[in-house]
C-alpha cells in the first residue's frame, strides 16, 4: 500500500482534516476481490457527480458534469481529479464551504466494475480509451472513458485549465437489448 500512499499525496495536500470530515486515507481498506465503483452527487460550487473506480489501492476519480447518462448518444465531460482513498467510497456529508470541494456529498450509485478488452486498465487509461462494465444499483452495462484530444495534433490531449489534469468523455456504450432508449435515472 506504499504506492497508494504516494498516490494520495495531492489529495491530502488539498485538505485540512481538522476542518473536513472527509477520510484522510489513514484507515486501511483492503482492496476488494472485485473492483468497486462509487458515484457521489457533489453539490459544490458547481453541481457535478464524482465518478470513482477502484484501481491499485485508490479510487481513480473524475468530476462528471451533468452526471452520467445511460443514453449512448449523450457524452459527458469528465474532468480527471486527484486519486481518492478507498474509504471515500463510504463518505457522505458536508464539506465546509471554506474547504476544497466545499458542499454536500451524497451517495448516488455504487457497485462493482470490470475492464473490457485486451488491455489492462492501466494501459487503457494511458492510451486514453478505457472500456469497462458497471454493475451498480442504478448504472449497469458497458461504458467508455475517452481522453479528449485538442486541435494541436493527433497526439495532443486537453488539460483542464484549473486542475491541469486530463479531460475525458464518459458515455454509455450500448442501448438496451430490446432496442428501446434507456430512461435517465432520477437525480
Could you describe each region identified by the protein language model?
Residues 1-187:
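A charge-rich, low-complexity, intrinsically flexible signal that marks solvent-exposed coils, linkers
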Amino acid at each position: 500500500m506504499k504506492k497508494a500512499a504516494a498516490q494520495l499525496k495531492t489529495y491530502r495536500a488539498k485538505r485540512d482534516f481538522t476542518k473536513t470530515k472527509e477520510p484522510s486515507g489513514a484507515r486501511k481498506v483492503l482492496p476488494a476481490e472485485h473492483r468497486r465503483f462509487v458515484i457521489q452527487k457533489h453539490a459544490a460550487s458547481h453541481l457535478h457527480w464524482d465518478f470513482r473506480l477502484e484501481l491499485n489501492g485508490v479510487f481513480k476519480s473524475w468530476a462528471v458534469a451533468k452526471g452520467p447518462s445511460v443514453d449512448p448518444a449523450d457524452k459527458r465531460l469528465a474532468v480527471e481529479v486527484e486519486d481518492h482513498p478507498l474509504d471515500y467510497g463510504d463518505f457522505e456529508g458536508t464539506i465546509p464551504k471554506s474547504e476544497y470541494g466545499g458542499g454536500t456529498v451524497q451517495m448516488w450509485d455504487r457497485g462493482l466494475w470490470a475492464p473490457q478488452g485486451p488491455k489492462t486498465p492501466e494501459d487503457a487509461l494511458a492510451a486514453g480509451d478505457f472500456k469497462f462494465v458497471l454493475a451498480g444499483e442504478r448504472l449497469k452495462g458497458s461504458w467508455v472513458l475517452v481522453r479528449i484530444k485538442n486541435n494541436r495534433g493527433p497526439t495532443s490531449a486537453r488539460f483542464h485549465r484549473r486542475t491541469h489534469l486530463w479531460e475525458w468523455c464518459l458515455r454509455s456504450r450500448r442501448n438496451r437489448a430490446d432496442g428501446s432508449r434507456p430512461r435517465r435515472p432520477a437525480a
